[in-house]
Amino acid sequence: MKILYTGANGLLGQKISAATPEYSNHAFLATARGLNRTKNLGTAAYASMDITDRLQIKSVLSKFRPDVIIHGAAMTHVDECELHKELAYQLNVIGTQNMVDAAREIDAHVVHISTDFI
């Protein structure tokens, strides 16, 4: 199975990366905006991907063709979301919609993970 996960530089993404060696029969692609800042990618490959950029998402997904997408990328700090409402909307709403739309095009299953604060 091929598994792509977003938010690789965040807490959840780092935990997934660390766990990938336990699932060596699966291929993993870790994604986040910009450079990889995760110290331990485990067995995952890394691709820079901005979830607000539909074309970039399509490009990454068409190359990797994941069966499952674990979507954990988000703006998670409540105070920052309040201060930067438009950015929070772009990342947490539009970015999520972009991921779902792109997943639908390649028939990938989406697991969306969030918090009760967002």
Listing of model-derived features with the role each one plays in the protein:
Residues 24, 64, 105-106:
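Helix C-cap/helix->beta junction micro-motif
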Residues 83-111:
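NAD(P)-cofactor binding segment of oxidoreductase domains
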Residues 41-54:
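Rossmann-fold cofactor-recognition segment
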Residues 6, 31, 69-73, 110-115:
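SDR active-site strand-loop-helix element
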Residues 51-91:
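NAD(P)H-binding glycine-rich loop region in Rossmannoid oxidoreductase-like domains
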Residues 1-23:
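N-terminal Rossmann NAD(P)H-binding glycine-rich loop of SDR-like oxidoreductase domains
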